[in-house]
A protein has these predicted regions:
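Residue-level signal for inorganic ion chemistry
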Residues: 11, 34, 45, 78, ...
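Generic detector of well-ordered alpha-helical packing
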Residues: 35, 39, 58, 74-77, ...
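Short, solvent-exposed loop/turn motifs
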Residues: 100, 128-130
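An extended, acidic
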Residues: 130-204
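N-terminal subdomain of lithium-sensitive/metallo-dependent phosphomonoesterases centered on the IMPase/IPPase/PAP
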Residues: 1-75
Length: 204
């Protein structure tokens, strides 16, 4: 939680500042805020968990010896960040032999911190979080990142079937949509294209 908060402070110092945007090899955007935030996350993990591995979006993988590895996404939703939209987040999770046991998402521009641990429950800004009790898709609020991702992954027909039935469909995307689900403000969030550092922090 502390690491996510510190990395989030770095991102806020660049948010809505006209920060320069570079293109990675896959043409996805990256900024100095992404890089500096991941450097801070790695620094704090090495300080407190020196034997753990680290895998981050911007600087790749460092092997460890403890059997645990940290998954880092310094800015999930860089396109939103660059656009000045506050729905981006700092993501981190710890993964071991039995899967992810701790995950944290911090939304710096909204000052929302959500974390969960195996056997510890889920917490949202210091209070217990729980999912909604909606049972029928006809009553559900559905979130998504981009409808184009469904077409690109040949799941467009599935997506169309879901959205035609749902009560409300909104493009509150990236990690924000999933946090809305975790805190009971939305009922489901769909994203067919995710990396380990995108989905790992959401699993606990």
């Amino acid at each position: 939680v502390e690491a996510a908060w510190q990395a989030g402070k770095i991102t806020l110092s660049y948010f809505q500042s006209g920060v320069e945007v570079d293109a990675k090899a896959d043409q996805s955007p990256v900024t100095i805020a992404d890089r500096e935030a991941e450097i801070k996350l790695r620094e704090l993990i090495r300080l407190h968990y020196p034997n753990d591995g680290i895998e981050g979006e911007e600087f790749g993988r460092e092997e460890g010896t403890s059997g645990y590895s940290w998954l880092l996404d310094p800015i999930d939703g860089t396109k939103s960040f660059v656009q000045g939209v506050p729905l981006y987040g700092v993501l981190l999770a710890r993964e071991g032999a039995e899967g992810v046991d701790v995950g944290c998402v911090y939304l710096p521009a909204l000052n929302e911190m959500v974390w969960a641990g195996r056997g510890e429950g889920c917490w949202w800004n210091g209070r217990r979080a729980k999912v909604s009790e909606t049972e029928k898709i006809e009553d559900a609020c559905i979130c998504f990142t981009s409808w184009m991702n469904f077409a690109a992954s040949q799941r467009d027909a599935v997506w169309q079937g879901i959205t035609k039935k749902a009560r409300l469909v909104r493009g509150w995307g990236d990690c924000y949509g999933h946090i809305l689900v975790a805190t009971g403000r939305a009922d489901a969030s769909f994203d067919p294209a995710m990396n380990p550092w995108d989905c790992g922090p959401l699993l606990p």
